[in-house]
């Protein structure tokens, strides 16, 4: 029998290949472990160990133990569903873990599961935990597995089995009379599960494809203690309140129409005003920093995408081709090849570099319908996309200026807490050692020169170049990846990009892809959730709502409105026959940042009574003074 060597807590053991982890732990005197980590992979006590390496025991309370426990809770939920609605009537899809819990995609014959069913499902899960079933692992041949799940009427499991590579082990886990196809890891028994709560239900297409059946996805969260679960539920309530999909509808920012297509955003008038302000800001800031604005088509010939490598490496994310004049065209998934075509439209001299091209470029990418999510995951979106072409000598200055631009932009939107990640050369890469050294050093130096800390993602760069990613922390503590600064050693070669140097010879330039916000759509979703819909004054579609106390104050309200409008302030009037307090409440619900109340005293003194959601009642201000006040707020990006 073949032997392997494993190291546990500094001591080496020689065991037979395929010995279950639990047996190895017995040999090593390890007690109370729920599983282990070997060569970066979490496995449970029943999993055969087939490779040498160091094993780190996993105990209750650790991050890895949550992965094991949450996986078992997904199975416990599936078993509960079968007990409640009939084993042969519940067909199981997939049931993975998530960052905070688990979900299972299921199809239930004759019953539509709703959120009202969740307490009943939870109760049944608690019963299964109380029974403390041992969780047992078995390995099957492909034929045995198909036969088993055919008998269990589990058509989706058979689908999965057929797609498992020939060389991969097929395993099932059993608890009581429940059995499921699964790689693991799992707890030793159901009784070892921690605290959990089922949180929501959604629809999910099988395999994420709209041409497949729609299943019911049931989500749960799980931690080791009730206290942690309660804290997360409180957090989820806050997340729900801030959901950009709800806010987008309430604030009339955007909509999605089935007849137009999933993942394709329709910007409504209020959202369009906000978007214009955002895009105007971006254009102005880019022009200030020496970028040149460009516009490019939404489609390009297949030859372009062949040269760029997209058809070879990215076709699954592209929309199907269309034929025009006997030639194939594709809608663009990226702007880069078009910007390169602009660069190559004439011979470039080193004196023109760095050349910085900027476009608010709309791109289209095929995403599975199951992953689409409001503005955060779409099929058509507009990137704040720039490409910088420079000489090797200019790289340090260019990267420092670009990172500074990214961070100052994010600060303008109210984000002040960043995490910066530097991703370095992977095992497989293109480009010379010199290119990688120059670019990685430039990225590192830029971060250090600007005084920021960073984490190195060793080997995490793309095969064509290293990059910086900037993540921001939002108002409720979530991290979002926004800015990217990415070197590319691939496209300059593919497109034969050159510049004429001082020696009058052609040289290959460095090229940098750069996005500050990522995309207008996703950034808007993040911004709406960060501010819970109450955007800063400078970004709000309506900055001021004017509310007259009575009908006789309408004329003065109109005068204030015209004055503000003439001075570039986006204002509205509420002239409805409603009580003043009702109008104020409506303005607050519409997330209008500044409310002006006008009555007899204001009309006589040419003043306005000012209140804001953030600062409360600011009292009376002379009209010109108010204009100065709000312009200062706008100037300071408040």
From Swiss-Prot:
**Record keywords:** Aminoacyl-tRNA synthetase, ATP-binding, Cytoplasm, Ligase, Metal-binding, Nucleotide-binding, Protein biosynthesis, RNA-binding, tRNA-binding, Zinc
Domain TGS, by residue range, is 1-59
Top-rank taxon, per record: Bacteria
What cofactor does this one take? Zn(2+)
Please provide, in alphabetical order, the Gene Ontology terms of the cellular component aspect for this entry: cytoplasm
- Where is the protein found, in the record's own terms? Cytoplasm
* Manner of cofactor binding, per the entry note: Binds 1 zinc ion per subunit.
Q: What is its EC number?
A: 6.1.1.3
Q: Name one GO biological process term.
A: threonyl-tRNA aminoacylation
- Enzyme kind, highest EC tier: ligase
**What's a Gene Ontology MF term here?**
tRNA binding
What is the official name of this protein in its record? Threonine--tRNA ligase
The coding gene here is thrS
